[in-house]
A protein has these predicted regions:
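C-terminal domain-closing interface element
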Residues: 29, 138-187
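Alpha-helical metal-binding/catalytic segments enriched in His/Glu/Asp
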Residues: 74, 83-125
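Acidic, glycine-rich active-site loops and adjacent beta-strand->loop/helix elements
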Residues: 78-81, 125-132, 170
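Active-site-adjacent substrate-binding region
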Residues: 169-313
């Protein structure tokens, strides 16, 4: 299986100063993908606006149609796909939107051809080609066009049993790998062990040993606490009880989110294939994001950390 065609088309679609959510909707509508429902919502912020996109792909045994198969959420986390007029072209920070939309495109095409996923797949991201930046060297840092918690609430809502949160994770000295990496599972304020099932998928997709982002407690507390966060990849856990795993697009050298010319198709193709493989297996009950028995022991002995770790985030 390859997702290269889908990626190339999505990158071409998004690398446009005039692109918006309606153009993304029109792109998919013109493909005749009947298993896909798309909603677009314009969100206005103090600094800019963005088009929030929600895509529902109905599984053959999914909850949307009355079934019982588990639903997977795929979030494309980012500040913006572009930073115009400061920077011209698609920026590194666009990776989350690119991968999530390419995965939706691939899964919907699979369904049309007769390769059906069991559970529903809900894809959420947003489109802003002119997101604001903050001063930073060697290139301006991406900023969110609207309040981040407004986006996070929308990303995490719905009947979702697990979430993959895809984000460019290149402007740090912690995870130094060309390709993509996954995180330990985060659930209700706890950082749990890395899912063995997701490790297996990572290995079969890349043919390489698994690469794991060493997230810390600081990375999962709300952005209202003014301390270092590797990025916002893990923030969706704040508004859901579903387990969240980050899919980080990574590089061996620091690449700012506002850098142009940084869209590495080969890295993104592997990450997209990983996301699609997880979607296929999760809905069929072949993948677990966490061990339910171990989780029960953790909660019965130590209790929930959700309220403690969510402090400062708006409800």
């Amino acid at each position: 299986m390859s997702t290269l065609k889908q990626l190339l088309e999505i990158v071409d679609l998004l690398d446009d100063p005039k692109v918006d959510g309606e153009q993304v909707r029109e792109f998919f509508t013109n493909k005749g993908l009947s298993h896909m429902e798309i909603n677009v919502e314009r969100i206005e912020g103090e600094k800019a606006s963005t088009d929030f996109i929600s895509i529902m792909i109905q599984g053959v045994e999914g909850k949307y149609s009355g079934g019982t198969s588990r639903s997977l959420g795929i979030i494309g986390r980012l500040g913006g796909i572009g930073a115009r007029p400061e920077c011209i072209g698609l920026v590194s920070d666009a990776d989350g939107a690119v991968v999530s939309l390419a995965a939706a495109y691939k899964i919907a095409e699979m369904m049309r051809r007769g390769d059906f996923v069991g559970g529903d797949v809900i894809v959420k991201t947003h489109i802003c080609p002119n997101a604001p930046t903050r001063p930073y060297k060697p290139a301006p840092m991406m900023d969110s066009p609207v309040d981040i918690f407004t986006l996070l609430k929308r990303e995490a809502e719905g009947q979702i049993d697990a979430i993959l949160s895809v984000d460019a994770t290149k402007a740090n000295w912690v995870i130094k790998h060309n390709g993509f990496a996954i995180t330990p599972t985060v659930k209700e304020g706890w950082i749990l062990k890395v899912s063995p099932d997701l490790i297996d998928i990572y290995i079969r997709v890349t043919g390489q040993p698994p690469v794991v982002v060493p997230i810390t407690m600081q990375d999962i507390i709300p952005y209202t606490t003014p301390v270092y966060h590797i990025n916002s990849m893990m923030q969706p856990w704040i508004y859901t009880k579903a387990p969240v795993v980050g899919v980080a697009i990574t590089t061996s050298m620091v690449v700012p989110g506002s850098a142009t010319g940084a869209t590495n198709i080969f890295h993104l193709e592997q990450a997209t294939r990983f996301v699609v493989e997880v979607a296929k297996d999760f809905g069929r009950g072949k993948v677990k994001f966490y061990d339910e028995e171990e989780w029960g022991k953790i909660i019965s002995t130590h209790g929930s950390l959700a309220d403690l770790m969510r402090r400062g985030a708006p409800k």
